[in-house]
């Protein structure tokens, strides 16, 4: 349709020009007619003079589309926003869509950390609560307030003592805490992890009931004789694991228990049920809108050792929010960059699918989809990613991830009007086809700090550029205890890993 309109328009312009050049008083209406006909025929014979060699009229029929940054900004301003909305690359996200969660996908160095910084700044300005699994302590350095916020790390001087026993209020909590520490397995490990959860749950319950501490917990999970552990688990679901003839199975199960429990060996041995409680902190923070933040920073060299512990603590924080009173007008942000590298966080799925009425807002970062599939399985990882309402797609050099992101942005149905001409005459044809709005190869070549923003709701996807924000670095992200003891822990971690791989569990 556009093609024919332009054809007619050019012919009219030609008519005016032709008649003016010849002199309107002399030719009158005939001059206009002659100019129109000549221009019409010239366009028909040589259309490339007007539209170029690839003469085609493209029109979007339906499906996805990507608009310019200025267009997306104009459309966003028409939406209703709170006084200080979360903005992604200068595009305001409607308040009602914040608890549909955020996902930032891109290779290292593309701008994900900047996005976390900018969302966190809005959360702090508004007085929202937050839970942060903090790689390299970047958000801790900018936002931690000593005396108000809480920093959890077994190696940091500012951290309170913590124990999983402090997360239990009744016998019903043993299974939940055990599942936070030993997440459900995928594939062949599913049943084995379940058996390991039975043993951990039984030990947690008995130690909690007897008023024990982390030292007791670690002793039974890692160093006690099988006979002592059997006596402790007597009467629980785990007791069947200790039956005669099940020695080989028990050895395998205890290896799993030990591999997860060794991170508890880094905790204060004297911490117990009266120590700092993540559950109480998060519930009070949510229900009273205290605006306090919980930081769990980790240095890169400590990540393999502490990531299972932090994953368990994040899971416990999620469970706490989900048991708080409903209030979809409050906001409690969960910042988990590179969420697929922490191991499996069991509570991520309920956070994304159930926390909206609690005011929970997940802000997740991801490098490539293979990491998510490895830890959560193909189908469940798809559920997790599709549960995020606001996506920002940055450069992704991984081919599988670029393909996944291209499909996620979507396809569009288009109509092409193609015009061709030759000495024999000219012809016009129409073609209807479906194509990707953006190709994987285009996503692989995006510059740093540029990408495609897709917000749930009526707004189309749009091109955006992230304005760099200089981090403030108000405090040191790590104020470590005796460095020599930390090095000792790191050496022990490596040695324990070798023993588990070569010898299995040794009671």
Region roles according to the model:
Residues 390-398:
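Conserved AAA+ ATPase "SRH/arginine-finger" region at the nucleotide-binding site
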Residues 407-413:
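Conserved AAA+ ATPase "sensor/coupling" helix adjacent to the nucleotide-binding pocket
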Residues 405-406, 423-427:
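Preference for solvent-exposed, low-hydrophobicity sequence contexts
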Residues 135, 367-371:
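Conserved H-loop
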Residues 1-110, 114-115, 119, 421-422, ...:
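Basic- and hydrophobic-enriched, low-structure N-terminal and domain-boundary segments
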Residues 162, 400-407:
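Conserved AAA+ ATPase core "coupling" helix
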Residues 48-56, 95-98, 105-110, 114-361, ...:
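P-loop NTPase motor domains
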Residues 143-146, 372-386:
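Short regulatory helix/loop adjacent to the ATP-binding pocket of P-loop NTPases
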């Amino acid at each position: 349709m556009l093609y024919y309109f332009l054809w007619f328009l050019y012919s009219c312009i030609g008519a005016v020009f032709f008649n003016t050049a010849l002199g309107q008083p002399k030719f009158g209406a005939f001059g206009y007619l002659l100019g129109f006909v000549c221009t019409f025929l010239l366009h028909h014979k040589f259309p490339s003079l007007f539209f170029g060699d690839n003469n085609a009229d493209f029109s979007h029929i339906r499906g996805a589309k990507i608009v310019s940054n200025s267009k997306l900004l104009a459309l966003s301003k028409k939406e209703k926003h709170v006084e200080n909305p979360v903005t992604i690359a200068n595009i305001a996200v409607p308040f009602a869509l914040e608890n549909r969660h955020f996902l930032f996908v891109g290779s290292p160095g593309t701008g994900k950390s900047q996005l976390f910084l900018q969302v966190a700044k809005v959360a702090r300005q508004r007085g929202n609560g937050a839970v942060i699994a903090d790689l390299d302590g970047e958000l801790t350095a900018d936002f931690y307030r000593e005396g108000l916020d809480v920093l959890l790390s077994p190696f940091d001087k500012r951290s309170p003592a913590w124990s999983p026993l402090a997360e239990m209020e009744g016998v019903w909590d043993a299974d939940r805490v055990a599942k936070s520490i030993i997440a459900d397995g995928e594939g062949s490990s599913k049943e084995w992890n379940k058996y390991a959860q039975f043993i951990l749950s039984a030990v947690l319950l008995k130690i909690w009931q007897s008023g024990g501490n982390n030292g007791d917990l670690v002793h039974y999970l890692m160093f006690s004789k099988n006979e002592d552990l059997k006596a402790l688990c007597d009467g629980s679901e785990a007791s069947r694991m200790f039956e005669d003839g099940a020695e080989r199975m028990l050895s395998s199960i205890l290896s799993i228990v030990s591999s997860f429990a060794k991170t508890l060996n880094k905790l204060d041995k004297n911490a117990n049920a009266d120590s700092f409680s993540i559950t109480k902190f998060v519930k009070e923070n949510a229900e009273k809108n205290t605006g306090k933040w919980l930081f769990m920073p980790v240095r890169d060299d400590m990540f393999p050792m502490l990531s299972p512990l932090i994953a368990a603590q994040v899971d416990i924080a999620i469970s706490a929010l989900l048991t708080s009173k409903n209030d979809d007008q409050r906001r409690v942000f969960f910042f988990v960059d590179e969420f697929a590298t922490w191991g499996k966080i069991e509570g991520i799925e309920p956070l994304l699918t159930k926390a909206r009425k609690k005011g929970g807002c997940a802000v997740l970062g991801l490098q490539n989809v293979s990491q998510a599939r490895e830890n959560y399985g193909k189908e469940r990882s798809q559920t997790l990613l599709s549960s995020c309402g606001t996506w920002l797609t940055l450069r992704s050099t991984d081919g599988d991830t670029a393909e996944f992101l291209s499909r996620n942005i979507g396809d569009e149905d288009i109509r092409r009007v193609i015009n061709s001409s030759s000495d024999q005459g000219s012809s016009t044809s129409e073609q209807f086809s479906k194509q990707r709005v953006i190709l994987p190869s285009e996503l692989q070549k995006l510059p740093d700090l540029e990408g495609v923003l897709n917000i749930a709701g009526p707004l189309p996807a749009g091109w955006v550029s992230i304005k760099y924000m200089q981090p403030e670095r108000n405090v040191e992200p790590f104020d470590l205890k005796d460095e020599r003891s930390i090095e000792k822990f790191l050496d022990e971690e490596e040695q324990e890993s070798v023993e588990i791989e070569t010898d299995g569990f040794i009671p």
